[in-house]
From Swiss-Prot:
Gene: tvp23
InterPro entries named in the record: TVP23-like
Function of the molecule: Golgi membrane protein involved in vesicular trafficking.
Glycan-carrying positions: N103
Organism: Neurospora crassa (strain ATCC 24698 / 74-OR23-1A / CBS 708.71 / DSM 1257 / FGSC 987)
One Pfam family linked to the record: DUF846
Phylogenetic placement of the source organism: Eukaryota, Fungi, Dikarya, Ascomycota, Pezizomycotina
Segments passing through the bilayer: 20-40, 46-64, 109-129, 134-154
Stated name of the protein: Golgi apparatus membrane protein tvp23
Length: 191
């Protein structure tokens, strides 16, 4: 019997342009949740579960921000501090429109995981509150800060990318005009 091939854009890691990056991204995204949910089955040491979950969340934050975002959807962000004024602002980077074709499967996995994980942590915070397990709330709060930061940053980065692509095509008559449009849009989103 023949196996049906998945359609492009479906949630099958086999269709990914970067399967190792995608699987590592999904492993980081799910591992912190799994350790939080099932850690007590393997050890009674709450501190150990807390530390492992924090390390996995930090690894997820770093991997998503610096590797998975760039390889899967062509987006990257970082925070810069002006040394003179001390003002902080986010900087967004996206791949050039003609240089990278974003795989629909990679994009669906990326955006689904980016928005689903903070929602799951909110549910876990509510469960911790109603089950009166307040000891877990600091861990959930840290998880929410890290996952929501990445979600907001990548959402803004995607909006910046779309706006600069529109501005770039409108002013594509010359490289200077495209750079001016990109810088204007970048300044608008960095406020």
């Amino acid at each position: 019997m023949m196996e049906a091939t998945p359609t492009p854009g479906s949630l099958s890691w086999r269709l990914s342009s970067h399967p190792i990056t995608l699987l590592t991204f999904l492993a980081f995204r799910s591992s912190s949740l799994l350790v939080y949910l099932f850690g007590l089955l393997f050890t009674d040491n709450l501190v150990m579960i807390f530390i492992i979950t924090i390390l996995l969340l930090a690894g997820d934050f770093y991997y998503l921000k610096n590797i998975a975002g760039r390889r899967l959807v062509g987006l990257r962000w970082w925070n810069e501090v002006d040394p003179n004024s001390g003002d902080s602002h986010w900087v967004f980077e996206s791949s050039e429109p003609g240089t990278k074709i974003i795989n629909a499967t990679d994009s669906r996995f990326f955006w689904l995981a980016i928005y689903a994980q903070p929602l799951l942590w909110v549910v876990l915070a509510i469960v911790a509150l109603f089950s009166l397990k307040f000891i877990w709330l600091p861990l959930v709060a840290i998880a929410l800060v890290l996952t929501i930061t990445n979600s907001l940053a990548f959402s803004r980065c995607d909006k910046f990318s779309q706006a600069s692509n529109i501005a770039g095509t409108a002013f594509s008559s010359g490289n200077i005009a495209g750079n001016i449009a990109s810088n204007m849009v970048g300044r608008f989103f960095s406020r």
